[in-house]
Amino acid sequence: MSEPSKLNVEIYGHIYTLRVTPEEKAQVEAITAHVDQMMHKVGDDQTRLDYRDVAVLAAMNITEEYFKLQREYQELLSIADEEK
């Protein structure tokens, strides 16, 4: 694996400097874009929320997506097992 280098990313108006390898860069950028999008989805509708509250609500929405995908994956595994 290559040596990490610095990557500046912006999430909800804040700049973060991360250390990533060239192999990780595209995935980190995609993750950053998704987190930023989810924070804007929450924060743009609720102007009275502070940054921390927006981050927590976005994290809850992202986790909900993750749990839904886990359930769907398990259902697909069950269907595949039944067809064997």
Model-derived regions, located:
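C-terminal structural segments of small proteins and small subunits
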Residues: 60-84
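N-terminal intrinsically disordered, cationic/polar leader segments
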Residues: 1-2, 6-8, 82-84
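Generic detector of leucine side chains in alpha-helical contexts
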Residues: 7, 18, 49, 57, ...
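Amphipathic, hydrophobic secondary-structure cores in small proteins
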Residues: 14-61
